[in-house]
Design a protein with these regions (language model features):
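Short, low-complexity, polar/charged sequence segments that are solvent-exposed and flexible
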Residues: 196-200, 313-317, 346
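Structural motif
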Residues: 176-178, 293, 324-326, 345-346
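Conserved amphipathic alpha-helical "coupling/scaffold" segments
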Residues: 1-178
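Conserved NTPase motor "head" modules and their coupling/switch loops across ABC/AAA+ ATPases, GTPases
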Residues: 2-14, 260-333
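Phosphate-binding glycine-rich loops of NTP-binding sites
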Residues: 336-347
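Conserved P-loop NTPase architecture
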Residues: 99-299
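Glycine-rich loops and low-complexity Gly/Arg-rich segments
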Residues: 201-206, 319-322, 342-344
Length: 347
């Protein structure tokens, strides 16, 4: 399952290297002020937003893609926060019940994976419920694709099948393991088998006892019990590893969903602060860098606006086709951002 809320065709890379001048760039733009307003003391929102801003996206299609998703977020802020809270719950629940999944023994790995997948099944059902209840109010390509995927892949039939298989893998009636004889008559190729369904009582009474080969280990035969335990572990080892990998896959999905939602949570926090100050916001129309299109009305310094108690005065510019701009610093005494620009076209 893919998230794709930052890019149309790939995940957001939280490990991507920052620009060589990231520190100086952050200081010049006073990003700490902006990031503080975005994060509201959420460390993940702070880190993801910092990387998203410093690793500047210049692809017009990617920018428009994110703008559509952000517009959905602004129309449905409570839904976005509900999604983010659900991802946080998933990560926290994973921490609490993952002690077995990292164990050395297949039986412990199997037990831990079953417990974790049962928890995740409930969380995935709740996630799909959010998509079903609110999908009609989201129109962006990113959220439309995400919600469609959740509704398609997490159907009631699928989740019921998962629950049934997890219940069966608890092996309450013991483990049926097959093996072949290898060199020295040692058991090899141990495989966990699904036992046949038991016949009804009347059938068993009519057929009578069935012949079988069996043996019983003495109560104090520790070596025999240990040998049986090892054979059982060899049989369930492939299944335990497969379940653990499935749990890891779901953890990765919730982790990436949390990471990419964190950026939009930061945008929501910032929008609330601007709205509280009565400051205008907009979605600019991006164009390719070589178009030299520079037109804006009421542009103001966001960080200055966040730090000043009073309002700030915006600036208007019509500078299409200009190549050079000289921008002065902020005039805080006059409570305004001074935007001085001169331009000349190179021959």
């Amino acid at each position: 399952m893919n998230v794709f809320l930052m890019y149309k065709d790939r995940d957001f890379d939280v490990q991507a290297p920052l620009p060589w001048n990231a520190k100086e760039l952050g200081q010049d733009l006073e990003l700490q002020t902006l990031l503080g307003a975005m994060s509201c003391d959420d460390k993940l929102v702070l880190e993801v937003s910092r990387r998203a801003l410093l690793i500047s996206e210049t692809d017009v299609q990617a920018i428009v893609y994110r703008q559509g998703i952000l517009a959905d977020c602004l129309r449905n802020p409570q839904v976005i926060r509900e999604l983010y809270d659900l991802t946080q719950e998933a990560i926290e629940r994973r921490r609490k019940c993952s002690y077995g999944i990292f164990g050395r023994y297949p039986s412990a790995i199997l037990s831990g994976a079953i417990e974790l997948l049962q928890v995740f099944s409930d969380l995935l059902r709740r996630l799909r419920g959010i998509a079903e209840r609110n999908g009609a109010t989201f129109t962006s390509e990113g959220f439309t694709s995400l919600f469609a995927m959740l509704k398609q892949e997490l159907s009631d039939e699928y989740l019921a099948l998962v629950a049934a298989q997890l219940s069966e893998l608890r092996l309450r009636s013991g483990a049926l393991v097959s093996a072949r004889l290898g060199d020295g008559n040692k058991g090899i190729d141990h495989v966990l088998r699904r036992p046949k369904k038991r016949s009804g009582l009347l059938t068993r009474l009519r057929e009578g006892p069935q012949p079988s080969f069996s043996f019983r280990i003495a109560d104090r035969d520790e070596a025999g019990a240990r040998a049986l335990g090892e054979m059982r572990d060899r049989g369930i080892n492939p299944v335990a590893n497969a379940l653990a990998q499935s749990a890891d896959h779901i953890v990765s999905f919730f982790t990436m969903l949390r990471v990419e939602l964190a950026f939009y949570i930061g945008c929501l926090n910032l929008h609330e602060k601007f709205s509280g100050k009565g400051l205008p916001v907009c979605f600019p129309d991006p164009v390719e860098a070589d178009k030299r299109t520079h037109v804006f009305t009421g542009l103001y310094d966001a960080c200055l606006a966040l730090t000043l108690e009073g309002g700030v005065v915006g600036n208007d510019v019509q500078a299409d086709g200009k190549d050079l701009f000289i921008i002065t610093g902020a005039n805080q005494a006059a409570s305004r951002h001074s935007f001085g620009a001169s331009a000349s076209r190179s021959s």
